[in-house]
């Protein structure tokens, strides 16, 4: 029997200003869905896998074809419903309603675990959407680069006087998310040694200029890191190996990195983490014929790696969990102090979330990189005093290779996002841009996620696991007129550990789009300020007052 999730065809998004659908509001999700499966974007496009273990864009290839066909015929007063990657219905709504509403991998809490999900997955009854895979707004490794850069810069501020020159970062994983780490480290001024078990992933990062060099030798990797740091150079190297083996070996040798983290796909113990002593080929085969053995061995190996990370932490080296739930896996394997070192959000990012600042991103549907150059210039024009952001845009232009449709990630917050959206829409209207653009974000944002081991770890009021907030975010973005809205479960940290929402809005140059953009790009980050203000963060409370938010039970207005 053929595998409905495997097909050797090559998918790439259309370019240019000619429509394949009835309007840009349906052309936009069509192009972004196809862009998610571009071979220059996706991790395993022939299997519909975009990134993050088994994060898919559609449930099966038949479902992909049905979604494409439906989007091509969808009217501007209709909404397509997508249930875990399957197009299940089209309903009459209105022109300001979303054209697509997506729900991926959501399970009733008692059954929200990998065992139950995997059973459904085998029967083609569910699909793991990760965050931006199943919501059709993945832009390649760039999508996480700036967030990783901001994290490393803040770590440098807190621990090394704001200067990472001559320092180096140890990490693991060069997949769709982890692949951003070497480039982010170099942009922040540090060297990076990234351990990756799958050589094809390291080669992908070499090809797209996210990592500088590759080796199979730990000794060679350490020698290069030593030479670069002594010379004050910021460069990166991928070491082909298993993080569960390399991290303890470095501890044993007494090697002391300046920062330690990890972005292996530890959230998925079957598909995301190579067990100690296994070959990649053996691992891939046993994922299909003996997944329980894979999970058992992977979890035991994660415990070994986290123990090494604890050893680094106890030696005084700044060490953080980068949101893959590896500490939780180690805790469940009996490592009682697995959470002794913090996650990256409470350690470095939460003050940004308090002001609604997060991973704002946009993509040029024209396919022309010049459209991104023009929008970069517009960001600088509208935010003239944000020199940190200008520096980021300059580095991004120089260092980041586009994957698929040209795109840009740019962390901005409440008060700025809607201004940029309106300006971009005006650029489409007056012909400065060759075609419309879409604006979206990661689900990792200030008001759109509940994830107690990542984005909402150690909330001030103890509300880490309250998931009303992403539900409200999705509802508000739907009411505000986003072009498509998604509500997912399990992204980043795995089944049972997160709920999160996403939105994308199309700048098609119309006055109707102006009104939608102003609502969506104000309300979306405002929910993040509201959520953090409700938790008692002074920065969020002050920002809510400054921006004039009406929060009756929080501000009494």
From Swiss-Prot:
<feature type="binding site">
    <location>
        <position position="201"/>
    </location>
    <ligand>
        <name>NAD(+)</name>
    </ligand>
</feature>
<dbReference type="Pfam" id="PF01175">
    <property type="entry name" value="Urocanase"/>
</dbReference>
<dbReference type="InterPro" id="IPR038364">
    <property type="entry name" value="Urocanase_central_sf"/>
</dbReference>
<protein>
    <recommendedName>
        <fullName>Urocanate hydratase</fullName>
        <ecNumber>4.2.1.49</ecNumber>
    </recommendedName>
</protein>
<dbReference type="InterPro" id="IPR035401">
    <property type="entry name" value="Urocanase_C"/>
</dbReference>
<dbReference type="GO" id="GO:0016153">
    <property type="term" value="F:urocanate hydratase activity"/>
</dbReference>
<feature type="binding site">
    <location>
        <position position="196"/>
    </location>
    <ligand>
        <name>NAD(+)</name>
    </ligand>
</feature>
<feature type="binding site">
    <location>
        <begin position="242"/>
        <end position="243"/>
    </location>
    <ligand>
        <name>NAD(+)</name>
    </ligand>
</feature>
<dbReference type="InterPro" id="IPR035400">
    <property type="entry name" value="Urocanase_N"/>
</dbReference>
<feature type="binding site">
    <location>
        <begin position="263"/>
        <end position="267"/>
    </location>
    <ligand>
        <name>NAD(+)</name>
    </ligand>
</feature>
<feature type="binding site">
    <location>
        <begin position="176"/>
        <end position="178"/>
    </location>
    <ligand>
        <name>NAD(+)</name>
    </ligand>
</feature>
<keyword id="KW-0369">Histidine metabolism</keyword>
<feature type="region of interest" description="Disordered">
    <location>
        <begin position="1"/>
        <end position="20"/>
    </location>
</feature>
<comment type="pathway">
    <text>Amino-acid degradation; L-histidine degradation into L-glutamate; N-formimidoyl-L-glutamate from L-histidine: step 2/3.</text>
</comment>
<dbReference type="InterPro" id="IPR023637">
    <property type="entry name" value="Urocanase-like"/>
</dbReference>
<feature type="binding site">
    <location>
        <position position="492"/>
    </location>
    <ligand>
        <name>NAD(+)</name>
    </ligand>
</feature>
<dbReference type="InterPro" id="IPR036190">
    <property type="entry name" value="Urocanase_sf"/>
</dbReference>
<dbReference type="InterPro" id="IPR055351">
    <property type="entry name" value="Urocanase"/>
</dbReference>
<comment type="function">
    <text>Catalyzes the conversion of urocanate to 4-imidazolone-5-propionate.</text>
</comment>
<feature type="active site">
    <location>
        <position position="410"/>
    </location>
</feature>
<dbReference type="Pfam" id="PF17391">
    <property type="entry name" value="Urocanase_N"/>
</dbReference>
<feature type="binding site">
    <location>
        <position position="130"/>
    </location>
    <ligand>
        <name>NAD(+)</name>
    </ligand>
</feature>
<dbReference type="Pfam" id="PF17392">
    <property type="entry name" value="Urocanase_C"/>
</dbReference>
<dbReference type="InterPro" id="IPR023636">
    <property type="entry name" value="Urocanase_CS"/>
</dbReference>
<keyword id="KW-0963">Cytoplasm</keyword>
<dbReference type="GO" id="GO:0005737">
    <property type="term" value="C:cytoplasm"/>
</dbReference>
<comment type="similarity">
    <text>Belongs to the urocanase family.</text>
</comment>
<keyword id="KW-0456">Lyase</keyword>
<dbReference type="InterPro" id="IPR035085">
    <property type="entry name" value="Urocanase_Rossmann-like"/>
</dbReference>
<keyword id="KW-0520">NAD</keyword>
<dbReference type="GO" id="GO:0019556">
    <property type="term" value="P:L-histidine catabolic process to glutamate and formamide"/>
</dbReference>
<feature type="binding site">
    <location>
        <begin position="52"/>
        <end position="53"/>
    </location>
    <ligand>
        <name>NAD(+)</name>
    </ligand>
</feature>
<feature type="binding site">
    <location>
        <position position="322"/>
    </location>
    <ligand>
        <name>NAD(+)</name>
    </ligand>
</feature>
<dbReference type="GO" id="GO:0019557">
    <property type="term" value="P:L-histidine catabolic process to glutamate and formate"/>
</dbReference>
<feature type="binding site">
    <location>
        <begin position="273"/>
        <end position="274"/>
    </location>
    <ligand>
        <name>NAD(+)</name>
    </ligand>
</feature>
């Amino acid at each position: 029997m053929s595998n409905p999730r495997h097909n050797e065809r090559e998918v790439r998004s259309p370019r240019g200003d000619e429509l394949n659908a009835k309007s840009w509001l349906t052309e936009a999700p069509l192009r972004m869905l196809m862009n998610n499966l571009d071979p220059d974007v996706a991790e395993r496009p022939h299997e519909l896998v975009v990134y993050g273990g088994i994060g898919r864009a559609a449930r099966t290839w038949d479902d992909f074809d049905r979604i494409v066909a439906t989007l091509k015929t969808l009217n501007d007063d209709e909404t397509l419903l997508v249930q875990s990657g399957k197009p299940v219905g089209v309903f009459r709504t209105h022109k300001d309603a979303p054209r697509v509403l997506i729900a991926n991998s959501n399970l009733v809490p008692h059954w929200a675990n990998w065992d139950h999900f995997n059973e459904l997955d085998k029967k083609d009854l569910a699909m793991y959407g990760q965050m931006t895979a199943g919501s059709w707004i993945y832009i390649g490794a760039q999508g996480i680069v700036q967030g990783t850069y901001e994290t490393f810069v803040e770590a440098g501020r807190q621990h090394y006087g704001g200067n990472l020159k001559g320092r180096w970062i140890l990490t693991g994983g060069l997949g769709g998310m982890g692949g951003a780490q070497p480039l982010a480290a170099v942009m922040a001024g540090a060297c990076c040694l990234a351990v990756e078990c799958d050589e094809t992933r390291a080669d992908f990062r070499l090809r797209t200029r996210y990592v500088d060099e590759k080796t199979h030798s730990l000794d060679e990797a350490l020698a290069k890191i030593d030479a670069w740091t002594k010379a004050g150079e910021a460069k990166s190297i991928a070491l082909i190996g298993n993080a569960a083996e390399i991290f303890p070996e470095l501890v044993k040798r007494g090697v002391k990195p300046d920062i330690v983290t990890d972005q292996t796909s530890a959230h998925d113990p079957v598909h995301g983490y190579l067990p100690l002593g296994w070959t990649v080929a053996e691992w891939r085969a046993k994922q299909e014929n003996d997944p329980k053995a894979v999970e058992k061995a992977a979890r035991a190996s994660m415990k070994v790696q986290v123990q090494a990370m604890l050893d680094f932490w106890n030696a005084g080296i700044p060490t953080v969990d980068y949101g893959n739930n590896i500490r939780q896996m180690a805790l469940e394997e009996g490592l009682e102090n697995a959470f002794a070192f913090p996650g990256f959000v409470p350690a470095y990012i939460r003050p940004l979330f308090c002001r609604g600042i997060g991973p704002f991103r946009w993509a040029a549907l024209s396919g022309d990189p010049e459209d991104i150059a023009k929008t970069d210039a517009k960001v600088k024009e509208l935010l003239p005093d944000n020199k940190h952001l200008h520096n980021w845009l300059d580095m991004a232009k120089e260092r980041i290779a586009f994957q698929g449709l040209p795109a840009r990630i740019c962390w901005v917050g409440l008060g700025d996002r809607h201004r940029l959206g309106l300006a971009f829409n005006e650029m489409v209207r007056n012909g400065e841009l060759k075609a419309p653009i879409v604006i979206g974000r990661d689900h990792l944002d200030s008001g759109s996620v509940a994830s107690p081991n990542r984005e909402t770890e150690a909330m001030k009021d103890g509300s880490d696991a309250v998931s009303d907030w992403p539900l409200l975010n999705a509802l508000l973005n739907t009411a505000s007129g986003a072009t498509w809205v998604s509500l997912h479960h399990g992204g980043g940290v795995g089944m049972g550990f997160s709920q999160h929402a996403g939105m994308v809005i199309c700048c098609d140059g119309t006055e109707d789009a102006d009104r939608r953009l102003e609502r969506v790009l104000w309300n979306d980050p405002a929910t993040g300020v509201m959520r953090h203000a409700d938790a008692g963060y002074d920065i969020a409370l002050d920002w809510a007052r400054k921006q004039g938010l009406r929060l009756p039970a929080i501000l009494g207005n």
